[in-house]
């Protein structure tokens, strides 16, 4: 999953970004399913199924169709160059490892490594949202961040199923909100580039 997060930062084609995100979601569902099996926590199988169906299949397909329908520019425009973004990603990953491994000294090694991995994925998702101008790739960054949250949550023993379900549905709701937002930008500015808003704001001053 961490490799997929770096691949999302590196990739400069929207459809490839969607494919990588779908692969990350599938890996998440496998990880959660494995946790459910090894820890005898059957309710996590529902979480794994939700991750697989929603973020591994439904959401990527929906975004793909939305891109085709809107005629969105297929290249990903970045605020920062790929090289600098990857270096920032490595720095954030190192930071997450140092923080988690230092804070969770009393926990077992498997839990510590899992939490460090989850935090790194969360930070890389935030980095993707910051360094991308295209609204669609920012949606993917947000959902990649949420993948990290779910991965961290599965490591918390006794996490109520209702919380996991609410997290899954919050992603679906956020998708609809972002979709409406994208359609509005396209309708008003004939672009899904967030920079279009900055130009309009500058013209109104």
What label would you give each PLM region?
Residues 1-205:
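Alpha-helical transmembrane segments of multi-pass membrane proteins predominantly involved
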């Amino acid at each position: 999953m961490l490799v997929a997060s770096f691949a999302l930062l590196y990739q400069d084609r929207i459809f490839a970004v969607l494919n990588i995100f779908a692969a990350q979601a599938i890996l998440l569902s496998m990880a959660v399913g494995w946790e459910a099996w090894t820890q005898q926590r059957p309710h996590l199988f529902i979480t794994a199924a939700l991750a697989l169906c929603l973020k591994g299949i439904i959401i990527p397909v929906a975004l793909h169709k939305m891109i085709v329908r809107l005629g969105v520019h297929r290249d990903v425009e970045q605020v920062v160059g790929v090289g600098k973004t990857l270096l920032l990603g490595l720095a954030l990953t190192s930071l997450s490892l140092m923080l988690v491994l230092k804070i969770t000294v009393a926990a077992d090694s498997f839990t510590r490594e899992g939490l460090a991995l989850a935090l790194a994925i969360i930070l890389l998702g935030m980095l993707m949202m910051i360094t991308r101008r295209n609204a669609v790739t920012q949606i993917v960054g947000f959902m990649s961040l949420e993948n990290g949250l779910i991965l961290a949550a599965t490591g918390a023993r006794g996490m109520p199923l209702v919380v996991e379900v609410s997290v899954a549905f919050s992603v679906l709701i956020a998708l609809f909100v972002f979709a409406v937002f994208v359609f509005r930008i396209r309708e008003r500015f004939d672009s899904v580039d967030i920079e279009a808003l900055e130009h309009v704001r500058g013209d109104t001053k």
